[in-house]
């Protein structure tokens, strides 16, 4: 699948998901390439249909895009609930376990998700996998002692790589932390791994989102298809 085909599937999923947002809602808006198409469609609806809703974003990038369309964006602490959050995912398996954080927004994404009544992911078909882990697992760490955390991960065989930008500098999250990507190839015991990561001193959050999502909208060549989590 080339990039144009993949973008077409992402756009279709984003447009389908935008239908979930109705007047008066408080909606969480995620981060990433698929979410950009979602926000484009919501911006169109605001302009052409008079849609009025309030957004809570998981990154400054999404906030800037949404505000460019005139969408009202507020801080998460200014709302008492979030009706639905729509976000992307880097991988999702049949058990509705996912990896997120390819865009370095995993901490804000998880905070918004855990405060949402409903969580929806939008992905193209390449993101649906049998077993998660082929996509490197992002882990957000504080800069102080980051090298020591990397050494601990190396000793455990997690194959960590500090994420760098085009200038060779560590990528910074919106909270000014670093991201370490774990090249695991496959994750057979995600719950155990999640517990090990979050109890490592220096780790702020990890990109494992386990059985959190309620619904996945998949951009498919035959049209968007919906996967509902039977456990939710």
UniProtKB/Swiss-Prot annotation:
GO molecular function: ribose-5-phosphate isomerase activity
Positions with a binding annotation for substrate: 31-34, 87-90, 100-103, 127
Metabolic or biological pathway: Carbohydrate degradation; pentose phosphate pathway; D-ribose 5-phosphate from D-ribulose 5-phosphate (non-oxidative stage): step 1/1
EC number assigned by the record: 5.3.1.6
Catalytic reaction list: aldehydo-D-ribose 5-phosphate = D-ribulose 5-phosphate
Any one GO CC term of the record: cytosol
Active site: 109
GO biological process assignments: D-ribose metabolic process; pentose-phosphate shunt, non-oxidative branch
UniProt KW keywords: Isomerase
Subunit structure: Homodimer.
General function of this protein: Catalyzes the reversible conversion of ribose-5-phosphate to ribulose 5-phosphate.
Family indicated by similarity: Belongs to the ribose 5-phosphate isomerase family.
Name of the molecule in the record: Ribose-5-phosphate isomerase A
Organism: Bifidobacterium adolescentis (strain ATCC 15703 / DSM 20083 / NCTC 11814 / E194a)
Name of the encoding gene: rpiA
